[in-house]
Amino acid sequence: MRFHSRILLLITCLLCTAIAFSQVKITGKVVDNSGQPIEFATVRLLGTAVGTNTDTKGDYEMTVPKADTLMVEFSCLGYSTVTRQLIKPEGTVTINPKLYEKTLELEGVEITEYKKQTTGMQGIDVEMLKRTPDASGGSVEAVLTTMAGVSSKNEMSSQYMVRGGSYDENSVYINGIEVYRPQLISSGQQEGMSIINPDMVRKVDFSTGGFSAAYGDRMSSVLDITYREPEAFEGAFAASMQGGSLMLGHSTRHYSQMHGVRYKRNSSLMGSLESKGEYDPQYFDYQTSLVFKPMDKLRIALLGNVSINDYRFTPKNRETSFGTSEDVKQFTVYFDGYEKDKFQTYFGAGSVTYLFNDKGTDLTLQASGYRTDELVAYDIHGEYWLDQAGQELGVGKYHEHERTRLKMNVMDLTLRGNVGINQNSISYGISMRKEDIYDRSRQWQWRDSAGYSLPHIPDQVNVIFTESSSNDLKTTRIAGWLMDTWRFTSGVGYWSLNAGIRLSHWNFNKETLVSPRVSLGFVPERNGNLSLRLSGGVYYQAPFYKEYRQQLLDELGNRTILLNKDIKSQRSIQVILGSDYTFRALDRPFKFTAEAYYKNLSNLIPYEIDNLKLVYSGINSSKGYIAGLDMKLFGQFVEGTDSWISFSLMKTQEDLYGVKVPRPTDQRYSIAMFFTDYFPNIPRLKFSLKGVLSDGLPTTAPHLTRADSYVRQPAYKRVDVGLSYELVGKDNRPLSGFLSHFKEIWLGLDCFNLMDISNVSSYYWVTDVNNIQYAVPNYLTRRQLNVRLSASF
């Protein structure tokens, strides 16, 4: 019996050896012309059914039968097909093909096909950022606000809302590192510039929901930015009526550096606001990105940022007309006082990455630090009149005072890695974050209407509102995640499955969170133009500074801010179903995208929106839901230029103190368009248009909630247009002289708010002696022209 077993084992070994020697393993990485990996590329052996697909790192591996000659084909939608011939291959063969973007020529116009999307992340063309008319000064977020499900209500701000979420529910990453924005910003005038420098951006990925476990505890969206690494000496500069920017980059074999400086003054734009006075805003931003590669498998990267926003305003007067054509009211104010705000942020990060092999196995140790020093200080006194057709409705005085100082330090240490195993890509990480917060604030408001101090108490003179805070806090957060992306091909089509889990703990409230997330993408074999996506999971909004500041009232109505140690993370259980369909119409490519979503919300911390300021209750006292449908048609409406139109329907509601009310972000509909064109006889003259029509948001009077009462703002309507003329380009670049050193030079003219529509950002509430309140709209900017010059070299 033992003899027969040995014979059987010997035969099995011989057969396995024969099979092994009769097969060839083919591995490698598929990249584009810039060296970036291409995911979802098809690798197949011609003449057989053997094939595979690349993973998220562009890597592939397959075993094929041995033959004298093998033909291996590499293809991907939007790229040219490459074929490699192998003559008598043996053992393991490595092929690293480079695919070039596939274009068609129609009368000299290039038309590029569109890639399939099997995950919740969508890519955004960086080139579109350069010539987009943007009143905020040229930000990445300006393009985002035209995407389905994304909206903004203030053209001077780079903040945005996604699918019923607030400004605080969006996370932003630069080179894999989470970045933050100032916390005390309450208006677009104060904000300045986005932390993202568009001149330094190489890649933009954006998710409106259903993102993976690798991203932190936010409920709404992820904006993932990757900065470029210069290939040689290069630079870019821009100047306009709003400000200017300069970027310089340099590269050697083992080292690359990039530096960007931006300066902005919005005086001309703010001059169109109804509050007249001396606006003196100054915004400065410096960023640097350094990369060292002492060896092929080792990469050391440094990222730094200094941002200083200095906003000064001396108001003089304001005249606002509002109401209907048959009921016009006039609000007039004469001011005396001064506002001085300063926001200083400093950010630095360093990472060391070691690449173990060409299969995408790497390990990164990353450390980052963020510091913000914010000051809001104003003393403004005013006398106002409210008239209706010559009849005086109210007259009075008011005084507003605030001194708020916030200092915050956030230190983060992260260890993360990736492991490539066949068709699986495993990602993992663990992080520890320490937060140190210093908060001092005192603010009050006093009003006198028709000679009476409000609130009117005969033997006292009281302010209408007072609030103070004095808090110091040091906390630690720990998080970890593990996820796997599995891409494979079956008889019915191509599949992409991502499943992961994220764990986090915060020592302030002793809360531990478990966040499972999963997404599935499918491209049917019978219809390669169609792709389907299904994603879902449990997402949390971990409280950060503003959310757990709780207001406590004493017997005199004074408010004191305390930190709520019983606060819990807001929770969102999400399900998202989406599809893409690519097609050609008029011999041009188009892609139609539709996504339906539902979010069950619990442990909500109610808040109200005043312009850009979110005022939280500081307690978990609400629950609700968000449901909606997003649609987008993307394509070349004009040959050779990409445009799109998006349409969104959404409903969000919450149970607030026993009353069902719309949430502050209840934007029931939104239509947005980004359109590009060129003049046929002057192809160097480009035209771009950005238009938005979105429903108004519910709002309420100060110190009240929507459970008491609310009004809905008018719809936000805005159209911005821009003309750009190419002075120097790849087809008209001089061979000698000064201009020969430039790659591109563009001269542009923008018209912001083409229709000169007065949009409402918030309301100023006036109360007369009879305690009747009038909502006086605070209008945003009117029509403005902007001239800009940009160049790259």
Language-model segments: residues:
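Gram-negative outer-membrane beta-barrel transporters
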Residues: 490-492, 597-600, 617-701
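Outer membrane beta-barrel strand-and-loop segments of large Gram-negative receptors
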Residues: 402, 406, 410-414, 568, ...
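Face-selective signature of the C-terminal outer-membrane beta-barrel domain
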Residues: 293-309, 337-509, 593-596, 644
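Surface-exposed extracellular loop regions of Gram-negative outer-membrane beta-barrel proteins
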Residues: 317, 525-574, 589, 596-616, ...
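C-terminal beta-signal and adjacent terminal beta-strands/loops
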Residues: 692-700, 725-793
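Membrane-embedded beta-barrel scaffold of Gram-negative outer-membrane proteins
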Residues: 362-368, 374-378, 566-620, 625, ...
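Short, acidic, small-residue-rich periplasmic hinge/interaction motif at the N-terminus
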Residues: 31-34, 41-46, 73-80, 89-133, ...
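Periplasmic N-terminal accessory/gating domains of Gram-negative outer-membrane beta-barrel systems
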Residues: 80, 93, 115-170, 176-211, ...
